Structures are given as structure tokens and as C-alpha cells.
């Protein structure tokens, strides 16, 4: 026997949507060495980050102080190359096709460095999507698996580091929310 139940919708604020974007950014960081999972978390991050401003507008619709303040902020965001890029990538991922991500990868080199006349580097992706790297130092050395370094990029005019761009976008949205909260406190 099954009993039907319905969840009571909880009001979702812009702050909660921001925490959702942070959640997916953290998942991106945790899965940056996984070619299957990272793109999913990136797509979810883009949607969550974009929804923060939608929720902010819905939350304060009809508030004249907010509407005056936000119209100026909206113009600033439209003129911001980073926000435009993130919005365009979100629109592409949501409405057209997956974003054409690329990744740069290589082995982690020990802090003390490596001095050799022969170095072999191996790289592969395992069945679970994890990037694996190995190094062999010297012709007679043993091949050892080492942690991979992975940087996700999009090939625009310049290679843009995805994690750095998303981190900057998060910080700018956080500053926007903080600015509105401070204005609310001043207004009483």
C-alpha cells in the first residue's frame, strides 16, 4: 500500500540559492579530477548561480528601494565580462548543448623537484572517470602513480580557468547580496 503525501513548499530565498551555488562549486572542486562528474557539477553550478538574482528579484518584488538599487546593479552585471560569460555558458548548457570543456592535466611534482635525465609521464582515465597520472624517473626507475593536477578550461579567445572564474562569480554575487543586506540594515 502506498500513501500519497505532498511536501509543503518552503519559501526559498536568494541566500539559500547562493548556498546551493556554493554547494555545487564545492562539488566541482572535489570532483575536478573526474571527467564524468565535473561537467555535471559545473552545469548545476551555472544554473544555481544564475538563479540567485532571479530569487532576489522575486523576493523583493514591489520594494521600491530594492528596485532602484537593483536596476543599477543589474546594469553593472550586464557590463561585467565575467557575469556575461557565466550567463552565456549557463544559457548554452540549459538550452542548447553541453559546454565544450577542456582540461589540462599532468602529474604532481614533489616539492623538492626532480633531477633526472629521463622522465616518463603517463596519463589515463579509469572506468569511473578519474584522471590517473604516473611518473617514472630514470630509465631504470619504477613507475609510480602520483596525484594528478587538473585544470578545466573553456577555449574562448583565451583559455579561462573554470574554477577561478566560478570562484570570482561566487564572490561577486556574495558581494551583491551583502550590499543589499547592508542597505536594508541602514534603512531599518
Description of each model-found segment:
Residues 2-43, 47, 64-188:
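Acidic, Ser/Thr/Gly/Pro-rich intrinsically disordered interaction regions
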Residues 51-55:
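Catalytic phosphate/metal-binding cores of nucleic-acid and nucleotide-processing enzymes, i.e., regions
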Residues 58:
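Glycine-rich, acidic and aromatic/proline-enriched surface loops and short helix-turn segments
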Amino acid at each position: 500500500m502506498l500513501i500519497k503525501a505532498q511536501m509543503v513548499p518552503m519559501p526559498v530565498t536568494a541566500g539559500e540559492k547562493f548556498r546551493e551555488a556554493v554547494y555545487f562549486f564545492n562539488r566541482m572542486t572535489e570532483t575536478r579530477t573526474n571527467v564524468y562528474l565535473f561537467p555535471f557539477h559545473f552545469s548545476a553550478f551555472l544554473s544555481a548561480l544564475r538563479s540567485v538574482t532571479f530569487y532576489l528579484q522575486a523576493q523583493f518584488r514591489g520594494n521600491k528601494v530594492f528596485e532602484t538599487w537593483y536596476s543599477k546593479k543589474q546594469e553593472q552585471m550586464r557590463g561585467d565580462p565575467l557575469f556575461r560569460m557565466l550567463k552565456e555558458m549557463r544559457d548554452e548548457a540549459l538550452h542548447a548543448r553541453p559546454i565544450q570543456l577542456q582540461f589540462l592535466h599532468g602529474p604532481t611534482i614533489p616539492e623538492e623537484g626532480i633531477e633526472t635525465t629521463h622522465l616518463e609521464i603517463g596519463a589515463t582515465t579509469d572506468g569511473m572517470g578519474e584522471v590517473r597520472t604516473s611518473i617514472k624517473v630514470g630509465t631504470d626507475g619504477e613507475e609510480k602513480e602520483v596525484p594528478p593536477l587538473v585544470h578545466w578550461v573553456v577555449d574562448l579567445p583565451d583559455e579561462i580557468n573554470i574554477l577561478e572564474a566560478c570562484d570570482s562569480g561566487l564572490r561577486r554575487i556574495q558581494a551583491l547580496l551583502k550590499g543589499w543586506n547592508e542597505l536594508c540594515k541602514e534603512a531599518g
